[in-house]
Design a protein with these regions (language model features):
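C-terminal "cap" of GNAT-fold acetyltransferases
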Residues: 51, 83, 117-131, 135-137, ...
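Active-site acidic-Proline motif in GNAT/NAT acetyltransferases
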Residues: 91-93, 97, 125-126
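Substrate-recognition "cap/lid" segment bordering the active-site pocket of phosphatases
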Residues: 96, 105, 132
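Short glycine-rich hinge loops at helix-strand junctions in the catalytic core
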Residues: 98, 115, 138
């Protein structure tokens, strides 16, 4: 099997949108409610929103296995020394193959190329599999946040 990670171009944002919708509906049910999943997908993963994110400095990486998109990451610079990992998602059937770690490492490399000394990320407090993966990669709990995102929904995250 051949896997590649590449900087996503504008046409690949539609693949990222499709992946996000599939992954979130499969993975997050049981962590957050279906209405919150649909709200967050509409707010953050529409093609229009992804294009706006890219136009304002968000970088997208796309992970492919044998040419097929199976995961992605997105990150942006907060300030000259800090990069924020906004998104890192992988199709569930590809978990536990090291692909998530490869996406994380690719993001870390991109951050250091930009001279950042810190990579921050948020993870839902109930996403125990992702928390464990980030801890294995050396990340630790920095702070907790509970913030409204609209329509009665909240993010309940750890910042690592």
């Amino acid at each position: 099997m051949t896997t590649t990670i590449e900087l996503a171009d504008l046409p690949q944002l539609s693949q990222i949108s499709d992946l996000a919708h599939s992954i979130w509906r499969d993975y997050y049910l049981g962590i957050i409610s279906r209405p919150q999943i649909e709200f967050m997908l509409a707010a953050d993963y529409s093609l229009d929103q992804l294009e706006k994110d890219r136009a304002t400095g968000t970088n997208f990486l796309i992970l492919k296995e044998n040419g097929q998109a199976i995961g992605f990451a997105a990150f942006h610079t907060l300030n000259p020394s800090v990069v924020k990992l906004d998104k890192l998602y992988l199709e569930t059937q590809h978990h536990r193959k090291g692909y998530g770690q490869r996406l994380l490492q690719a993001t870390e490399r991109a951050a250091t190329e930009d001279a950042a000394s810190l990579l921050l990320l948020n993870v839902n407090k109930h996403n125990v599999r992702a928390i464990a993966a980030y801890r294995r990669a050396g990340y630790s709990h920095h702070q907790s946040i509970l913030a409204p995102i609209g329509y009665g929904f909240f993010v309940d995250d750890y910042v690592l």
